[in-house]
Amino acid sequence: MAKLIAFALVASLCLSMVLCNPLPEEVQEEGLVRQKRVTCDVLSFEAKGIAVNHSACALHCIALRKKGGSCQNGVCVCRN
């Protein structure tokens, strides 16, 4: 009985995956959207006296192998 239930579960999962796939003419390829202001808008906050404002931007720029960076008008600008 347990094998029958397991088989029915696997079969229903496979069937649902096949039915949920979009048709080839329905597939829409959209470009990747980059949010350039995330490090300066979302991550600029202060909690218990600790401000993250320009630190998140500087870390982002260092990860891009730049010398650092800061927020200017809500946009992270990296130094060369």
From Swiss-Prot:
Localization recorded for this chain is: Secreted; Target cell membrane
Provide one Gene Ontology biological process annotation.
defense response to fungus
* Region forming the signal peptide: 1-20
Which InterPro entries does this chain map to? Defensin_insect, Defensin_invertebrate/fungal, Scorpion_toxin-like, Scorpion_toxin-like_sf
Q: Which GO cellular component terms are attached?
A: extracellular space; membrane; other organism cell membrane
Which cysteine pairs are joined by S-S bonds?
A: 40-71, 57-76, 61-78
Induction (UniProt): Up-regulated from 4 hours after E.coli bacteria injection and higher expression level is reached at 16 hours.
Give any extra note attached to this record: The nonamer peptide CopA3 exhibits potent antibacterial activities (MIC=4-8 ug/mL) against both E.coli and S.aureus. This peptide (LLCIALRKK-NH2) is shorter than the mature peptide, amidated and with a Leu at position 60 instead of a His residue.
**Name the record gives this protein:** Defensin coprisin
Species of provenance = Copris tripartitus (Dung beetle)
- Lineage, broadest ranks: Eukaryota, Metazoa, Ecdysozoa, Arthropoda, Hexapoda
